[in-house]
Amino acid sequence: MTKIAIVTDSTAYLGPKRAKELGVIVVPLSVVFGEEAYQEEVELSSADFYEKLKHEEKLPTTSQPAVGLFVETFERLAKEGFEVVISIHLSSKISGTYQSALTAGSMVEGIEVIGYDSGISCEPQANFVAEAAKLVKEGADPQTIIDHLDEVKKRTNALFVVHDLSHLHRGGRLNAAQLVVGSLLKIKPILHFEDGSIVPLEKVRTEKKAWARVKELFAEEASSASSVKATVIHANRLDGAEKLADEIRSQFSHVDVSISHFGPVIGTHLGEGSIGLSWYIEK
């Protein structure tokens, strides 16, 4: 039986306990405030990041892991007797992390590195990792795992509502005119991943109406399914996340609802107060 390791990056926001339970290795991305870089969830927690954000005039930037960090990780796994690594990462359209993993894989001898572009991030990415880890424990071969991840991708969706448009503007996803008009009209864009990129799905007036629409879109997919895993993801807005989670639980008894968070790297792009809803149609 092939000895397979699962590697991912920090934007899955697994946390140390869950990563250990799954038996996966996490390579961190970084956020950069001025000249200072911090590995997210290692040198800078999500709570500290959002607190720091309140006192900084300039929005931080983000940085993918260096190729060398992946090389070190893969070399260590090779020495530990692993024959194959399946390296699962956030969308290659929003970060070069996936490409860094592939580059590192081509530089390391004695182990095969198979990259997997999740086309998404955060809890949906974590679900890819969890599904892969489960199959590894069941003794599946690499191709079976990749084929299963492709099936998971077809049944995964996520929608986000951004609280403050200025983060999207400063990150280059909205121009100045869109920012002014959107702010004046209280427009709350519903965002989603399309071919791996974060793009507006619909533009709705007021946050309340935006979330009503998100629940409608969720219902269109979830109502006819028999088993659904949903996650409410928040950027330092636990009260809003809990409220939405309770609403979904009361409306859909067959949906397993959990709560997760946008950590520093993804929080930099979406901004504090943003909330997302992701789901995976199990059957």
Curated annotation (Swiss-Prot):
Protein name: DegV domain-containing protein BH3627
Location of the DegV domain: 4-281
Key words, A-Z: Lipid-binding
Purpose of the protein: May bind long-chain fatty acids, such as palmitate, and may play a role in lipid transport or fatty acid metabolism.
NCBIfam families, alphabetized: DegV (TIGR00762)
Organism: Halalkalibacterium halodurans (strain ATCC BAA-125 / DSM 18197 / FERM 7344 / JCM 9153 / C-125)
Keyword Cell inner membrane part of the UniProt annotation: no
Family matches, as Pfam families: DegV
Protein residues bound to hexadecanoate: T62, S95
UniProt-listed InterPro entries: DegV (IPR003797), DegV_C (IPR043168), DegV_domain_contain (IPR050270)
ATP-binding among keywords: no
UniProt GO MF annotations: lipid binding
Transmembrane segments: none
